[in-house]
Amino acid sequence: MPSVKVRENEPFEFALRRFKRICEKAGILAETRKREFYEKPTQERKRKAAAAVKRQMRRTSRDVTKRKRLY
């Protein structure tokens, strides 16, 4: 778990902001949301496959738009 030591004469809000930033970088909130409810293995595979298709479509659409410009 990330920890933050409050420096001398440092306001609590600044330390809290640093802690939030560290947690965000570590991905703790995303992990918590993901584990909030049980996800069946088949549902997880479906979700990951759909994300891969979406990524691939986005990647190919970017390539197509880059090649279209002939000016």
UniProtKB/Swiss-Prot annotation:
One Gene Ontology biological process: translation
UniProt region (Disordered), positions on chain: 39-71
A Gene Ontology cellular-component term: ribosome
Molecular functions (GO terms): structural constituent of ribosome
Record-annotated membrane-spanning stretches: none
Biased segments, Basic residues type: 45-71
Protein name: Small ribosomal subunit protein bS21
Organism in which the protein naturally occurs: Xylella fastidiosa (strain M12)
Gene encoding the protein: rpsU
